[in-house]
């Protein structure tokens, strides 16, 4: 994995990442013209997981890097008890939280979703935290961009799925790791 930025301290990383989420032009776009597109896209993804018995109604779900919360709303509409975190909170939907230090008890969630792997400064810590908060029989879906030019807020670039990502899962069984059609959020690979 290639790291794209160097910081003298962790606060510099957080400040850099917050710039994207706090950008008023981006936020307005996420909350208006992209809201329905992303909400419908997430509902499709999660509906497929329900149909395939990966998810069940009333399960507890956590969305990491949820920004303005479309994935949370989608999961709630499908009957899950969903919450989300981001380094910048959003109204009642998204709580302030750090993907590298999840403030939840061990085995708290049946499902964890994230599509911000590329924004992780410490991917091994992010995956370790996901595994810690997942229940033993829980599922995690991570979607990301592979071999697609990143923006200035990406912290890492995946060079090898097996080495850079799959090897980080120490307590999990990989159900699939596969290419997907580039979706509404620009993601083209997913791991379940």
Residue ranges of each PLM-predicted region?
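Class I SAM-dependent methyltransferase Rossmann-like catalytic core
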Residues: 1-53
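Class I SAM-dependent methyltransferase SAM/SAH-binding core
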Residues: 60-101
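A short acidic, Gly/Pro-enriched loop at the edge of an enzyme's catalytic core
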Residues: 100-112
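A short SAM/SAH-binding and catalytic strip from SAM-dependent methyltransferases
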Residues: 110-123
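A short glycine-rich, Lys/Arg-flanked "PGG" loop and its adjoining helix->strand segment in the class I
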Residues: 124-139
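Conserved class I S-adenosyl-L-methionine
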Residues: 141-170
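Core SAM-dependent methyltransferase catalytic element
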Residues: 172-192
